Protein backbone atom coordinates (compact mmCIF):
# COMPACT_ATOMS: atom_id res chain seq x y z
CA UNK A 1 0.00 0.00 0.00
CA UNK A 2 2.81 2.41 0.87
CA UNK A 3 4.52 1.78 -2.46
CA UNK A 4 1.32 2.67 -4.33
CA UNK A 5 1.56 6.24 -2.98
CA UNK A 6 5.30 6.65 -3.52
CA UNK A 7 6.56 5.48 -0.13
CA UNK A 8 8.20 2.49 1.51
CA UNK A 9 6.79 0.74 4.55
CA UNK A 10 9.80 1.18 6.81
CA UNK A 11 10.88 3.33 9.72
CA UNK A 12 14.03 4.34 7.88
CA UNK A 13 12.03 5.63 4.92
CA UNK A 14 9.62 7.55 7.12
CA UNK A 15 12.47 9.10 9.06
CA UNK A 16 13.99 10.29 5.78
CA UNK A 17 10.70 11.63 4.39
CA UNK A 18 9.82 13.33 7.67
CA UNK A 19 13.13 15.15 7.53
CA UNK A 20 12.63 16.21 3.92
CA UNK A 21 9.11 17.52 4.59
CA UNK A 22 9.83 19.15 7.95
CA UNK A 23 7.63 16.69 9.85
CA UNK A 24 8.88 16.25 13.39
CA UNK A 25 6.67 13.52 14.86
CA UNK A 26 3.80 11.12 14.23
CA UNK A 27 1.03 9.36 16.15
CA UNK A 28 0.50 5.70 15.27
CA UNK A 29 -3.16 4.58 15.13
CA UNK A 30 -5.00 1.36 14.36
CA UNK A 31 -3.09 -1.06 16.57
CA UNK A 32 -4.51 -4.57 16.56
CA UNK A 33 -3.46 -5.89 19.95
CA UNK A 34 -3.52 -4.83 23.58
CA UNK A 35 -0.19 -6.48 24.36
CA UNK A 36 2.10 -3.71 25.55
CA UNK A 37 5.12 -5.57 24.23
CA UNK A 38 3.81 -5.19 20.68
CA UNK A 39 3.85 -1.40 20.92
CA UNK A 40 7.48 -0.44 20.65
CA UNK A 41 8.15 2.51 18.37
CA UNK A 42 11.15 4.83 17.94
CA UNK A 43 10.43 7.38 20.66
CA UNK A 44 12.01 10.24 18.73
CA UNK A 45 9.62 9.60 15.84
CA UNK A 46 6.31 8.28 17.18
CA UNK A 47 3.80 8.20 19.99
CA UNK A 48 0.84 5.84 19.69
CA UNK A 49 -2.84 5.55 20.55
CA UNK A 50 -3.88 2.12 21.79
CA UNK A 51 -6.62 0.96 19.44
CA UNK A 52 -9.82 -0.85 20.41
CA UNK A 53 -10.62 -2.10 16.94
CA UNK A 54 -12.75 -5.04 15.79
CA UNK A 55 -9.92 -7.52 16.32
CA UNK A 56 -9.78 -6.51 19.98
CA UNK A 57 -13.53 -6.27 20.64
CA UNK A 58 -14.73 -8.77 18.01
CA UNK A 59 -17.37 -6.35 16.68
CA UNK A 60 -18.75 -5.87 20.16
CA UNK A 61 -19.41 -9.58 20.66
CA UNK A 62 -16.50 -10.30 22.97
CA UNK A 63 -15.41 -7.65 25.46
CA UNK A 64 -12.43 -8.64 27.64
CA UNK A 65 -13.40 -8.40 31.31
CA UNK A 66 -10.11 -6.72 32.08
CA UNK A 67 -10.34 -4.26 29.16
CA UNK A 68 -10.03 -1.13 31.37
CA UNK A 69 -7.00 -2.61 33.15
CA UNK A 70 -5.32 -3.43 29.84
CA UNK A 71 -6.01 0.05 28.48
CA UNK A 72 -4.69 1.64 31.67
CA UNK A 73 -1.40 -0.22 31.31
CA UNK A 74 -0.96 1.58 28.00
CA UNK A 75 -2.06 4.97 29.30
CA UNK A 76 0.57 4.73 32.03
CA UNK A 77 3.28 4.63 29.34
CA UNK A 78 4.77 7.97 28.23
CA UNK A 79 4.79 6.70 24.64
CA UNK A 80 1.02 6.15 24.65
CA UNK A 81 -0.74 9.44 23.99
CA UNK A 82 -4.37 8.29 23.84
CA UNK A 83 -6.98 5.71 22.90
CA UNK A 84 -8.45 5.06 19.43
CA UNK A 85 -12.04 3.80 19.04
CA UNK A 86 -13.64 2.27 15.95
CA UNK A 87 -17.41 2.31 16.64
CA UNK A 88 -18.52 1.62 13.07
CA UNK A 89 -16.44 -1.53 12.87
CA UNK A 90 -17.34 -2.72 16.37
CA UNK A 91 -21.02 -1.85 15.91
CA UNK A 92 -21.08 -0.21 19.32
CA UNK A 93 -22.54 3.17 20.17
CA UNK A 94 -20.03 5.54 21.71
CA UNK A 95 -22.42 5.78 24.67
CA UNK A 96 -22.25 2.01 25.27
CA UNK A 97 -21.36 1.32 28.93
CA UNK A 98 -18.29 -0.62 27.81
CA UNK A 99 -16.64 2.69 26.93
CA UNK A 100 -17.46 4.53 30.18
CA UNK A 101 -14.38 3.31 32.09
CA UNK A 102 -12.23 4.10 29.05
CA UNK A 103 -13.47 7.69 29.06
CA UNK A 104 -12.81 7.98 32.79
CA UNK A 105 -9.29 6.64 32.35
CA UNK A 106 -8.62 9.07 29.52
CA UNK A 107 -9.75 11.92 31.75
CA UNK A 108 -7.63 10.71 34.66
CA UNK A 109 -4.48 10.40 32.55
CA UNK A 110 -5.27 13.58 30.60
CA UNK A 111 -5.02 11.81 27.25
CA UNK A 112 -7.53 12.07 24.39
CA UNK A 113 -9.93 9.54 22.93
CA UNK A 114 -9.63 9.54 19.14
CA UNK A 115 -12.67 8.21 17.29
CA UNK A 116 -12.99 6.96 13.73
CA UNK A 117 -15.92 8.90 12.27
CA UNK A 118 -17.53 8.93 8.84
CA UNK A 119 -16.98 6.43 6.04
CA UNK A 120 -15.59 3.00 6.82
CA UNK A 121 -13.12 0.94 4.84
CA UNK A 122 -15.49 -1.93 4.17
CA UNK A 123 -19.23 -2.35 3.66
CA UNK A 124 -19.88 -4.68 6.61
CA UNK A 125 -19.25 -1.84 9.06
CA UNK A 126 -22.26 0.24 10.13
CA UNK A 127 -22.16 3.97 9.45
CA UNK A 128 -24.73 4.92 12.09
CA UNK A 129 -22.20 4.15 14.82
CA UNK A 130 -19.48 6.26 13.19
CA UNK A 131 -21.70 9.26 12.44
CA UNK A 132 -20.45 12.48 14.07
CA UNK A 133 -23.72 12.88 15.99
CA UNK A 134 -22.89 9.68 17.88
CA UNK A 135 -19.74 11.41 19.11
CA UNK A 136 -21.79 14.42 20.20
CA UNK A 137 -23.57 12.31 22.81
CA UNK A 138 -20.36 10.91 24.26
CA UNK A 139 -18.69 14.33 24.33
CA UNK A 140 -21.67 15.95 26.01
CA UNK A 141 -21.89 13.21 28.64
CA UNK A 142 -18.13 13.29 29.34
CA UNK A 143 -17.24 17.00 29.23
CA UNK A 144 -13.87 16.54 30.96
CA UNK A 145 -12.68 13.95 28.45
CA UNK A 146 -10.96 15.19 25.27
CA UNK A 147 -12.13 13.65 22.01
CA UNK A 148 -10.61 13.76 18.53
CA UNK A 149 -13.10 13.36 15.68
CA UNK A 150 -10.91 11.58 13.15
CA UNK A 151 -11.49 12.26 9.44
CA UNK A 152 -13.78 15.22 10.30
CA UNK A 153 -16.72 12.81 10.01
CA UNK A 154 -16.34 12.77 6.23
CA UNK A 155 -18.69 12.91 4.32
CA UNK A 156 -21.03 14.13 7.08
CA UNK A 157 -19.39 17.53 7.03
CA UNK A 158 -22.31 19.64 8.24
CA UNK A 159 -22.87 17.44 11.28
CA UNK A 160 -19.14 17.26 11.99
CA UNK A 161 -18.93 21.04 12.00
CA UNK A 162 -21.89 21.22 14.38
CA UNK A 163 -20.32 18.74 16.79
CA UNK A 164 -16.99 20.57 16.72
CA UNK A 165 -18.63 23.95 17.19
CA UNK A 166 -20.87 22.80 20.04
CA UNK A 167 -18.43 20.81 22.14
CA UNK A 168 -15.27 22.54 23.42
CA UNK A 169 -13.85 19.14 24.41
CA UNK A 170 -13.93 17.91 20.79
CA UNK A 171 -11.14 18.40 18.27
CA UNK A 172 -11.06 17.12 14.69
CA UNK A 173 -8.30 15.74 12.53
CA UNK A 174 -8.20 15.97 8.75
CA UNK A 175 -6.76 12.53 8.07
CA UNK A 176 -8.03 10.16 5.41
CA UNK A 177 -9.88 12.69 3.25
CA UNK A 178 -7.98 11.47 0.17
CA UNK A 179 -6.77 8.05 -0.92
CA UNK A 180 -3.96 7.35 -3.36
CA UNK A 181 -1.89 9.76 -5.43
CA UNK A 182 -3.41 13.09 -6.41
CA UNK A 183 -2.55 15.99 -8.69
CA UNK A 184 -3.85 18.85 -6.60
CA UNK A 185 -4.71 21.39 -9.29
CA UNK A 186 -6.73 18.80 -11.17
CA UNK A 187 -8.35 17.50 -8.00
CA UNK A 188 -9.54 20.92 -6.86
CA UNK A 189 -10.91 21.59 -10.33
CA UNK A 190 -12.75 18.28 -10.71
CA UNK A 191 -13.88 18.11 -7.07
CA UNK A 192 -14.59 21.82 -6.67
CA UNK A 193 -18.02 21.20 -5.15
CA UNK A 194 -16.84 18.83 -2.45
CA UNK A 195 -13.66 20.80 -1.75
CA UNK A 196 -15.69 23.99 -1.44
CA UNK A 197 -18.08 22.39 1.04
CA UNK A 198 -15.22 20.97 3.08
CA UNK A 199 -13.42 24.29 3.20
CA UNK A 200 -16.61 26.17 4.06
CA UNK A 201 -17.66 23.87 6.89
CA UNK A 202 -14.17 23.91 8.38
CA UNK A 203 -14.15 27.70 8.32
CA UNK A 204 -17.66 27.86 9.78
CA UNK A 205 -16.50 26.26 13.02
CA UNK A 206 -14.06 29.09 13.84
CA UNK A 207 -12.12 26.34 15.61
CA UNK A 208 -8.71 26.36 13.97
CA UNK A 209 -7.22 25.86 17.43
CA UNK A 210 -8.90 22.42 17.51
CA UNK A 211 -8.31 21.22 13.94
CA UNK A 212 -5.36 18.86 13.44
CA UNK A 213 -3.37 17.72 10.45
CA UNK A 214 -3.39 13.96 9.97
CA UNK A 215 -2.78 11.59 7.06
CA UNK A 216 -4.09 8.03 7.61
CA UNK A 217 -0.77 6.93 6.11
CA UNK A 218 -0.04 4.76 4.14
CA UNK A 219 -3.09 5.57 2.01
CA UNK A 220 -1.73 8.97 0.90
CA UNK A 221 1.52 10.52 -0.25
CA UNK A 222 2.73 12.69 2.62
CA UNK A 223 3.98 15.59 0.52
CA UNK A 224 0.81 15.71 -1.56
CA UNK A 225 -1.36 15.56 1.53
CA UNK A 226 0.43 18.48 3.15
CA UNK A 227 -0.36 20.48 0.01
CA UNK A 228 -3.98 19.34 0.19
CA UNK A 229 -4.43 20.54 3.77
CA UNK A 230 -2.68 23.81 2.97
CA UNK A 231 -5.43 24.53 0.45
CA UNK A 232 -8.11 23.96 3.08
CA UNK A 233 -6.66 25.91 5.99
CA UNK A 234 -5.82 29.63 5.84
CA UNK A 235 -2.07 30.18 5.94
CA UNK A 236 -2.28 32.13 9.18
CA UNK A 237 -3.50 28.92 10.87
CA UNK A 238 -0.94 26.52 9.40
CA UNK A 239 1.32 26.49 12.46
CA UNK A 240 -1.65 25.56 14.65
CA UNK A 241 -3.10 22.97 12.28
CA UNK A 242 0.18 21.29 11.34
CA UNK A 243 1.91 21.35 14.73
CA UNK A 244 0.64 23.24 17.75
CA UNK A 245 -2.79 21.64 18.08
CA UNK A 246 -1.61 18.03 17.88
CA UNK A 247 1.30 18.77 20.20
CA UNK A 248 -1.14 20.15 22.77
CA UNK A 249 -4.05 17.73 22.33
CA UNK A 250 -1.90 14.59 22.40
CA UNK A 251 0.52 15.97 24.99
CA UNK A 252 3.56 15.19 22.84
CA UNK A 253 5.84 17.64 24.63
CA UNK A 254 7.66 18.68 21.46
Put a short name on every predicted segment.
Residues 3-9, 26-36, 55-66, 90-97, ...:
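Acidic-and-aromatic substrate-binding clefts and catalytic sites of carbohydrate-active enzymes
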Residues 11-15, 34-38, 68-72, 99, ...:
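Generic structural signal for well-ordered alpha-helices
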Residues 1-25, 78, 200, 204-212, ...:
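Mid-to-C-terminal alpha-helical segments outside catalytic/metal-binding sites
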Residues 47, 95-212:
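Catalytic pocket-lining loop regions of alpha/beta-barrel enzymes
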Residues 18, 83, 106, 151, ...:
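Conserved, mostly hydrophobic/aromatic
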Residues 18, 38-40, 75, 139, ...:
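N-terminal cationic-hydrophobic initiation segments that often serve targeting/anchoring roles
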Residues 32-129:
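Active-site gating/metal-coordination segments in enzymes
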Residues 29, 86, 244:
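Conserved residues at the C-terminal ends of beta-strands
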Amino acid sequence: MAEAVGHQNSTEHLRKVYGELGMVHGVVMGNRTLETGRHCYPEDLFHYCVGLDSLVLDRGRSIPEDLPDQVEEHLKRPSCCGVKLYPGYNRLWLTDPVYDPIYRLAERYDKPVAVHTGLTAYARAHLKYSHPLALDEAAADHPRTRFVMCHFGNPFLQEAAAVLGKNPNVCADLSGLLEGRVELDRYFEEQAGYAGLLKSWLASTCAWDRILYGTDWPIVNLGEYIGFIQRLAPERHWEAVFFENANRVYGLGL
